[in-house]
Amino acid sequence: NMSQLPGYRTGGTIHLVVNNQIGFTTLPADARSTRYCTDMAKMVDAPIFHVNGEDPLTVIEVAQIALEFRQKFRRDVVIDIYCYRRHGHNETDEPLFTQPDLYSIIKVHPLLSTTFAAQVSALGTVTADEAAGIKAKLLEKLEAAFSEVKKKSESKKKKSEFAGSTAIFQPPYSHEPVNTAITVATLDKVAAAITTVPEKFNVVPKIKRTVVDRRLQVWKDGGPYDWGFAEALAFGSLLLEGTPVRLSGQDSRRGTFSHRNSVLYDEVTRDRYFPLKNISPEQETFCVYNSPLSEYAVLGFDYGYSMDFPSMLCIWEAQFGDFANGAQIIIDQFIASAEAKWRRPSSIVMLLPHGYEGQGPEHSSARLERFLQLCAEDNMQVCNITTPAQYFHVLRRQIHRGYRKPLIIMSPKSLLRSEDAASRVEDFTNARFEEILDDPTIKDPKKVNRVVFCSGKVYYDLVRGREEAKQTAT
């Protein structure tokens, strides 16, 4: 489904299916409702080739056709290679227990290397002796490599032994502060861009009034800046510094809560205008996409994107944080553990709108506790941000540190436009990300006899409760 979508196209993917016609012990009749396992590709009109795995020359011919198709049309193509599994699913599996009829045939079936050697000998390409020699050399090479591996102790592996692999070694996690402040000039340049609309561009009146004009007034007044403005400042400043930004998710262009509006629409012509693409001719690329409704597929794609483009700020946003459960496999198998398993770090950012705002049980919790349970050995960062400026700094810190770690952010909902949750100019130009913030409402710390550690929306709820109770010692 993603193959022809803007923001998710690859220019065509060649899908190779090594079809053993069995899954552990499950036969096709129990595994799917379609005739072929590749029938799902029909939904995007991808050509599908079914080829006999016992005929390597035809497999090569089909592969060449598939490659030429992909290069010419930039679309997906599928090759379904019909094969069989000679042994069990693993070293301890005995397939005769569940498919005795099938494996009684396979047991006496000649090896492909034998039948193919006879085929090329009949064609006069190689003699039988030459074919046997090629096979012997290959087996000798494999045995030598296997013997070498057995000699090495896994516990004594050195970084040099990963040379040529995809492993990436990086510095350990550090709590050292990172300079993420920007100059007033940079802030003004980004603010000017996101509050400027081209002449004769007919912005929807309500958007002009509540977004463009309002942001313009906030900028002229010198703040305070809300969540959406702070995010735009983070994106824009990174773009000016040479860092590309990619944001992908359900309704991400507007923002589920209409707080972002990264794309303006002409109500007459339906033309689109991207303010963050028009800050400076020298800026880097800004990409923002509304995604299809498969969290699993899209987060997987964006995670891969973050691996291929490590210098990019790559963000996946859930429509509501609850929906991350649809992508739990990507989170568990890759985001939380890929660095430990394969030395493959990622700086993917996940924005998960979180908070009980009266929208029902499926739109309230990003399951903060799940992500905290997955944290171990500095594998990722989980942040419940309290102020727009801290959101600004944590996004910029993601790029400016000397290592990569996934960043999980519990995004707010009610705080997006809250006057209480707004930041001053100096919070962007003379500050950094702080893991602990002072309570700015406390005038005399000596009178405090109780300290509560909290974050995010909880802080504002507690401040409100403290004011109502006229309590000054907490």
Identify the meaning behind each predicted range:
Residues 77, 83-474:
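Flexible, glycine-rich loop/tail regions that form catalytic "lids" or insertion modules at the edges
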Residues 10-11, 36, 43-44, 72-74, ...:
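Short, solvent-exposed loop/turn segments at the edges of secondary structure
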Residues 25-34, 40-78, 82-88, 96:
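Conserved phosphate-handling catalytic cores of large alpha/beta enzymes
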Residues 5, 40, 69, 237, ...:
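Hydrophobic/aromatic ligand-binding patch that stacks against planar heteroaromatic rings
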Residues 14-15, 41, 47-52, 383, ...:
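Short hydrophobic alpha-helical runs that function as membrane-insertion/retention elements
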Residues 13-14, 351:
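Interdomain boundary/hinge elements
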Residues 5-9, 20-22, 70:
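Ligand-binding clefts of soluble mixed alpha/beta catalytic domains
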